Amino acid sequence: MTNSNATAHATLHTSEGDIRIALFGNHAPVTVANFVGLAQGTKDYTTTNASGGSEGPFYDGSIFHRVIDGFMIQGGDPTGTGTGGPGYDFVDEFHPELKFDRPYLLAMANIGRPATNGSQFFVTVGKTPHLNNRHTIFGEVVDEDSKRIIDTIAHAPTDRADRPVKEVTINSITVEP
């Protein structure tokens, strides 16, 4: 899989800098549509978003609430606790061309059971083959500057619950074709 297979690009505007990600809508169409809809505020959700509202962009103001150096950085929870989501779950989309065989892949977090995707996502910072066919891969970080920002976040000091000591905020997400 290469970034030339991208159907859209998302830019996560974070407190550490911009992270540009290619989205693989041809391989994970439901997941990409969910992520884009939540990012743009065009998809309905039944919980409070990270800004405290019930409509509009879901991720704006959320944080990377779980960071494990050498493994991944996780965000997308409006509560910042690891337990929040949009109020619904949706199906997994495993594609044979998408494997956790390299770092910087964007995937959905879940609760360890099938079809429990919601809004939480993570970006890997190493090879994680044990996640194959357990988490839907739907994108990949596209450039070296973005990878450096991911690495900076991954190396951030954390507490015992893997939460960064200094919050790393997703200010907004923009999506382009």
Predicted regions, residues:
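Cyclophilin-like peptidyl-prolyl cis-trans isomerases
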Residues: 1-177
